[in-house]
Every structure is written in structure tokens, then in C-alpha cells.
């Protein structure tokens, strides 16, 4: 029996999600940024999804961003926070997601951010 222990990185796709996505993976696969008909249908689906997520979270659709994955999401969140709130110091650990460490490292190398690392021991 195989046991998968990396659900923090990638999880199995829920069958309900797969069924909802099949049309967009097979027939309606247009680029939502394109101006042609297939692209516009894809754009409509993305916007409908944005409104659905916003409604579930009691948020504005303008506050919902879809990204390609953790790296892009982490970069947007960190860069936005650092710039918007004029963050000059970040505290993290060496166990943090690689994308977070790379983004913080880049800001540190550019002299825009001091980064401190908490020590990790057997208790966390």
C-alpha cells in the first residue's frame, strides 16, 4: 500500500472538481486572455468562478485572484505586503516554502528587507 505524505504540496483532485473542469480541459480550453470566441468563453467561466468564490468568502470579486500555484501566490502576497505596508523586517524559518525563502532572499539582496530566521529544534 502506498501512502502519500505531501498533501501540503499537491493533493488529489476531488472528483467533483474534476467533473466541473472536464469541459474546460477538453472542449472549452480557450485562453481567457484571448479575444477570440473560445477565449471569451473561458474568460466568462473564470469570472463566474471568481464571483462564486467571492460569494462563498463574503468578499468582493475584485479581491479574488487566481494564480497558477503556490510560488506565484506567495510572490504576489509577499511582494504586495512588503510594498504596501513598507515592511522592512521579516521573520521566517528555514522550513518555509522555497518560493517564500527565494522572494525574501531577493528583497534582502536588494537591501529592501532584513530577514531573520528562527531556530528549529525537535519541538518545532
Language-model segments: which ranges?
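Pyridoxal 5′-phosphate
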Residues: 1-124
Amino acid at each position: 500500500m502506498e501512502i502519500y505524505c505531501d498533501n501540503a504540496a499537491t493533493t488529489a483532485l476531488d472528483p467533483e472538481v474534476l467533473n466541473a473542469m472536464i469541459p474546460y480541459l477538453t472542449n472549452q480550453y480557450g485562453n481567457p486572455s484571448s479575444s477570440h470566441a473560445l477565449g471569451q468563453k473561458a474568460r466568462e467561466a473564470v469570472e463566474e468562478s471568481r464571483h462564486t468564490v467571492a460569494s462563498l468568502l463574503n468578499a468582493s470579486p475584485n479581491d479574488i485572484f487566481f494564480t497558477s500555484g503556490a510560488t506565484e501566490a506567495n510572490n504576489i502576497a509577499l511582494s504586495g505586503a512588503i510594498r504596501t505596508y513598507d515592511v522592512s523586517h521579516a521573520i521566517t524559518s528555514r522550513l518555509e516554502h522555497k518560493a517564500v525563502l527565494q522572494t525574501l532572499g531577493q528583497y534582502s539582496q536588494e537591501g529592501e528587507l532584513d530577514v531573520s530566521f528562527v531556530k528549529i529544534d525537535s519541538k518545532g
